[in-house]
Structures are given as C-alpha cells and as structure tokens.
C-alpha cells in the first residue's frame, strides 16, 4: 500500500519538477548563461555526474522540488548576490553569470520554468485527446432539483443553455466549468426555451461531491441534471492538429480556474480543505495509478499547471518575484537596491513558508 502511493507520487512530482527546471536550464543555456547544477530534490546528493559543460546533474534525498543553479547564484533561489559576492567571480564567470545578463535574458530564463509547465500540460492533453477523444453532451436540462438555485431562477426541464455570464456554451461540460468555481456569485444564464431566448439569474451553492479518484470535493452547482436522452452524449475524435488546439483551449481553462480559485481563496470564499500539499497529492497519485496510467498522466497535467501558476505569483523567491524585480529594474533603469531585495526576499520567504505550513497542516490535521 505504501509503495503503491509513494512510487506514483514520486513519478508525478519528479516529472513536473524536471520539466519546470528544464525550462530554466534550456532557455538559460540558450541565453549564454552558465549552469553550475541541475538538481531534482534538495539536501544530500544521492547520485550525480558532471557533463562536458561543467554542469552537475544530481538527484538529492528530499524529492520535494528542484533547482537550477546558474553561475553567480549564491543559493538555490537565484537571489541577487551582493557586490562582495560578485567580486569573488572570475572575469570568465562574470561573462556567463546570471545576474550580469541583460534584463530580457534573465526574464526569459525565469519565465521559461512556468511556461514549460504549461507546455507539459498541453502535450499531455494533446496525447490524451488524440488517443481517446472526448465525450461531450448537449447543454440541455433534463431535470431541475427542487428548491435549487435553478428552480428558484425559473429554469425548466427541456431548456437549453446558450450562454453563462456572456460566455457561449456548446456542451454541458462548458456549463459545469463556468459554474463550478463560482459559489455565491450571481450568474446570468441565457436559455433557449420553445425557440425563444430567456434570460435568468441564479446563485450557485456549494455541494459536496465525489470526484473520479474518490476524493470529496466541494463544487458550486445550480441544481440541473443532464441525461442520455436530452444530452445525446457523443465521442469527439481529433486529428493531431485538432488535438493540440483542444489541448491549448483546455489548458487555458485549467489556468483560468486555478487563478479564480486562488483569488477566491485569498478572500475567504473557498473551502480551505480544497487546498492540499504533498500528502494529498501523494494520496491522489496512488488513487490515480490504480485507475490506470492515463489517470496518472492527467494528474501530472493538472499539477503542472498548478506549479506553473503558483511560481508566477509576484512573491520572492518564486519566479514571479524575480520577474517583478526585473520589471522594476526596467522602469527605474537600475537594479533594485540590495537592502530592498533582502527585505522583499525575507518577507516573501516567510509568506511561502507560512503557506507550506498551512497546506501541511491541512494534509495532516485540518481536513
């Protein structure tokens, strides 16, 4: 049982971290930046080797992340070295040091990590869509739950969803996607009834459901049901190009939902138990592996978006924090002062550690 959870968890996390760090590495090398180390994991090195460029590739004992250490980096977070630390570099090292490069090279190298995460998700979805296709159903209402938001809004069996808050819908899944993350929001629905469009408003409410992995999740619903007779479920098959286009669209939806969730979570409008850390991810990986490899790679795709999105938040020492400093540097035309950088990194690191502590607490005791 333990290995049945641990092995899938390590697979999922290692793939996501490797792709993220490979983004930093490849773009950094393309920009002419020297790389001292590429590490999967933290702590003591388990195995490793040096390549012909002098980069140390290694696997470390604590598999909860990874890093690329560029020439000039004084730690794994690529924080700005002090002037005294830069003086310890040789002239050759200064030429390829990360922090001596043009702003656009540093920004491109930093943003490449999250972008590679998004690309990984697109690749996974593309392969899944091309291999298995996708089942969809017409956006029809077969039943309306009594006393539900839909019933109070006047939605009736036989109605067809046309749009949700101005977004056109083509499938019942589109309706679920646009509603599921908006509990407590007043949403405008345009329905097609007897050949005429009818506009109604409803406020979704949270309902606890079980997802495909058996986890209890809370999603916003309005209380409508689709069925085979009205929904007419069908399998959509894709050409390779069509699969990529659908994957890009689906990845965009996942990114949008992730941002929407974090925004609502920050103001207390989401259940704290919906946010988990390594323990929850490990549990999900174990369950996904039991259902089949395609479920495991779907988890890779979803986690990859989450890691990419979180890293873009403008908080030092995350990638987004670095990008924020580069933006300020571009505006004021000089690097941010060492004192300001140090204060920002300390505050950001404290915030990140508090967040990590929160999700660990959720995993072990809170939920």
UniProtKB/Swiss-Prot annotation:
Top class in the EC scheme: hydrolase
Transmembrane regions: 108-130, 291-313, 343-365
Record: residues binding Zn(2+): 20, 24
Cofactors: Zn(2+)
Biological processes, Gene Ontology terms: proteolysis
Name of protein: Putative zinc metalloprotease mll0638
Gene3D superfamilies in the cross-refs: 2.30.42.10
Active site residues per record: 21
Entry's family note: Belongs to the peptidase M50B family.
